[in-house]
């Protein structure tokens, strides 16, 4: 089972907002490490924010302290949702040395990572978090 979450960068507070795709309400804020820091938080979702998260269509493991069982990231434009690109599959193949389309490297570097570090991610190019697991929806 999978749930789609839209991740939006709030550069004024230096946080990433997670919310179910199609929902108008803001989701819980997750702190973003600075560009020079490689450390990560233990939990992708602060426990204090769990009560404010609309849990419809999310897997049961999403609100657990250890996070969802499996996360996948895709990218898409709001105007062309049919053309999502699976970042996890591409990255896994690259790590194994398998041939991949070389279009991904400049796309990820120029469109996502550079803009993320600069805090200028275009609202038309969001990242979506796909939580896939064997748990039932809440």
Curated annotation (Swiss-Prot):
InterPro entries: Transactivation_prot_X
Region of interest: Mitochondrial targeting sequence: 68-113
Region (Disordered): 24-48
TM segment ranges: none
Keywords: Activation of host NF-kappa-B by virus, Activator, Apoptosis, Host cytoplasm, Host G2/M cell cycle arrest by virus, Host mitochondrion, Host nucleus, Host-virus interaction, Modulation of host cell cycle by virus, Transcription, Transcription regulation
Gene Ontology biological process terms, A to Z: DNA-templated transcription; symbiont-mediated activation of host NF-kappaB cascade; symbiont-mediated arrest of host cell cycle during G2/M transition; viral genome replication
Subcellular location as annotated: Host cytoplasm; Host nucleus; Host mitochondrion
Domain of life where this protein originates: Viruses
PTM entry text: A fraction may be phosphorylated in insect cells and HepG2 cells, a human hepatoblastoma cell line. Phosphorylated in vitro by host protein kinase C or mitogen-activated protein kinase. N-acetylated in insect cells.
Gene Ontology cellular component list: host cell mitochondrion; host cell nucleus
Similarity-based family: Belongs to the orthohepadnavirus protein X family.
Function: Multifunctional protein that plays a role in silencing host antiviral defenses and promoting viral transcription. Does not seem to be essential for HBV infection. May be directly involved in development of cirrhosis and liver cancer (hepatocellular carcinoma). Most of cytosolic activities involve modulation of cytosolic calcium. The effect on apoptosis is controversial depending on the cell types in which the studies have been conducted. May induce apoptosis by localizing in mitochondria and causing loss of mitochondrial membrane potential.
Subunit structure: May form homodimer. May interact with host CEBPA, CFLAR, CREB1, DDB1, E4F1, HBXIP, HSPD1/HSP60, NFKBIA, POLR2E and SMAD4. Interacts with host SMC5-SMC6 complex and induces its degradation. Interacts with host TRPC4AP; leading to prevent ubiquitination of TRPC4AP. Interacts with host PLSCR1; this interaction promotes ubiquitination and degradation of HBx and impairs HBx-mediated cell proliferation.
Protein name per the record: Protein X
Native source species: Arctic squirrel hepatitis virus (ASHV)
């Amino acid at each position: 089972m999978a749930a789609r979450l839209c991740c939006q960068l709030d550069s004024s507070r230096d946080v990433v907002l997670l919310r179910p795709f199609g929902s108008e309400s803001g989701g819980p804020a997750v702190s973003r490490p600075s560009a020079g820091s490689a450390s990560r938080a233990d939990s992708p979702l602060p426990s204090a924010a769990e009560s404010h998260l609309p849990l419809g269509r999310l897997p049961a493991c999403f609100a657990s302290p250890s996070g969802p069982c499996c996360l996948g990231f895709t990218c898409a434009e709001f105007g062309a949702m049919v053309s999502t690109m699976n970042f996890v599959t591409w990255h896994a193949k690259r790590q194994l040395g398998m041939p991949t389309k070389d279009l991904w490297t400049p796309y990820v570097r120029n469109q996502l990572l550079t803009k993320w570090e600069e805090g200028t991610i275009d609202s038309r190019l969001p990242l979506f978090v796909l939580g896939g697991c064997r748990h039932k929806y809440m």
